[in-house]
Amino acid sequence: MKAVVIGGGVFGSLIARELTKYDLEVTLIERNLGVGWGVTKANSAVVHAGYDDPPESVRAQFCASGNAMYEDLSKELDFDFKRIGSFVVAFNDEELKELERLLKQGEENGVPGLTILERDEVLSMEPNLNPEVKYALYAPTAGITEPWMVAIAAVENAVQNGLKLVLGESVVGFEKVNGRVKKVHTSKGEYEADIVINCAGLHADEIAKLAGAEYVPLHPRKGEYILLDKKLQGLVKRVIFPTPTKVSKGILVLPTVDGGILLGPTAEDLPEEMKDRPITTREGLEKVREFTKKLVPSLDFSLVVKTFSGLRPESPQKDFFIKVSETVKNFVNVMATRSPGLTAAPAVAKYVVEELIQEKMRIPLEKKKDFKPERKRIVHYSELPLEEWRREIERDPRAGRLVCFCNEVTEKEIVEAIRRGARTLDGVKFRTRAMFGRCQGGFCMARILKILERELGVDMSEIKMKSENSWVVNGKVRK
């Protein structure tokens, strides 16, 4: 029995890992040269509590349950997850009514610990909030993580359990027999399939169309962000939401897992043809500055590290579309996975395998006896106690050679990232946080290129930033 998962974002990665728990041949096809680089890469990194989703929605079905799975999942896969809680703040009695509605809705969704706090308690917990705040809905189960690392960790563990990972190939068609997909055709080859799971993010509607399956039309909703320096660590301790609107949860202020402060996102609907254009604008970033200053007046915008934008898949029904196709019997759609997609993904992965494939499609799956649930992260040596780090340097001097000074990433970490599959600068960046600091690679990029060249045994001119067409250097000036 062969299963093919299309798309290596957080949904595709976790579903692929879930499938490797069974006696299946599992293939994950990702068009980029690394996993977690599409919708997954650029979002708010919030593991939502689950109060924001209407109880009758598919989103509500998976949000609170997905949230509850993150503790164990982060321990198994060894990625950062911090359950820091969140505030939805209100500045007047009209906004208080919205907090009361969210509280009731969250209780219906099974979200534990929700409570509305008054001004003094809010400011005692978050003293840097705007002193004009009157109330806050406190959700203690909300958390933060690194979305791309969830995908990377899941895929690394799945590969340990037999996953075939195919990178740099786009799905271009399907071969069907008697209304079932038999082969998936890509830009470079073909793959036999008894089960196909479509997790292609913003392009999932196009993949479903190619297969002749049902779909909902998707368009990109752009969110622009500002990342501030770790010098502001502790400015806020929780995820700070404004009172939400009909369009979005609002523009947030939140800490990142490694100590920075993230601001955003905006919410701008774009035409379908802009699915692959996550650009920032002067107007969008100004909106982020304006709205977040209302939440935390002391924000220091002289400490900007990076601005960026992300695109999430929005659909007319504003809800997930997770179904077995009626027209293509072995084809599962996991699409329209807008917020809270990151939160819901672990629960959706179990649902797809246990409910849709085994129950609805009536495909019996046999669990492996030798499934390995754990994966270990790359050791970040500067986080070790000094004596332990010294011993590591004695064993391997590369553990003491700093390459990225902003985030204190060593040569050994970069070599380990390459050993685990990094073939591009972004492949190294998202596994190690090198080039994520204040200089954004201005100092360390050239050194990382040399390490990639040495370890891969290729000329530097062949190394890409991210995609097939993103060359970094054209050749040597001196030979």
Placement of each model-derived feature along the sequence:
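Glycine-rich FAD pyrophosphate-binding loop
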Residues: 20-42
